Amino acid sequence: MRLRVSACGGVFATDGQVVWDDYLDHRQFVLGPDSDAVLRWFIRWRDRDSVPERHRPVVEALLANDVLVAEGSQRDAQEQAVLHAWGRWGPVARAYHYSTRTTRGSRFSGVEAPRPVGTFRDAERIPLPGAEEARWLHRDLLDVLRVRGGGGGGGREFGDGGVSVLALGAMLQAAGGSVSSTELYPVVRDVDGLKPGVYHYDVQGHELALVGDFVGDADLIAACGDQAWVAGAGLVVFYTSLVWRHDSPRAYRVLQLDAGHVNQTLSLAGAALGLRTAFTAAIRDELVEELIGCDPATELAIGCAVIGGAVGGGVVGGE
């Protein structure tokens, strides 16, 4: 019988112990002092009895716990199927997916949602007009969906006109109107009635906090993965997610969906106002973190909405 180290697990250190994590079956196994030599030996297929006699009890223990896998076994077939399907995404992606995959015996728990933490109380604050003050070009949902689907409200080409502060207030109020783990950071470049700079949106007060200076074309393009088209926008809204809603790593999946819902609402509101909006997740996280001033340990950069006036139009969303 030939054995090798499982391809669907990994090693981490915790509380002074070295632990093998089997993410397919959600099991952890503490590795003893002789395990290292055995694992290194079976890094490729080798005969079960090819190790010295003193290591054979370790081999049996590792095999019983699926740290070692027997060639042709059910576990081997399962791993081969996973590797075939997930190989191009690399080991980290499949490890996360299967580690957070729930089973019929999974138990769920939640925590009470705290107040938003990113309120920047010491920053200059600017109250925003309510959504009712903006000039809405489309009020029927079907009309808005038609405009978005036909490219009129979405795209990567923008007109010379900027965005009005009335339109900005309306979009942010619509997008941030529910309890969410998503934070919004508008980078204002050409918004009529608002100083250029980096802001944070306070959903409770419906106001902006000025947290950074004007962002030039080069810095914005670099943060957005060298996509030159973003420089034509009057407004870029970066989305971040706070890890607080759940005590399970599965919450990372939910953070992405949450930001997507917020962006879709903002995009539909933008289309209803006659604006053009686009979304990109091709961002350089590190540059975005520096640009908006967030801590990557607690606040994760997700992507951004890029917003501007329609081609051939003036300032959009005002009276």
What role is predicted for each listed range?
Residues M1-A251, Q256, A278-E319:
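N-terminal accessory segments that position/regulate proteins before the catalytic core
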Residues A259:
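Active-site glycine-rich loop that binds ribose-phosphate moieties when present
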Residues V262:
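Gly/Thr-rich phosphate-binding loop signature of adenosyl cofactor/nucleotide-binding cores
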Residues G274:
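Structured binding elements
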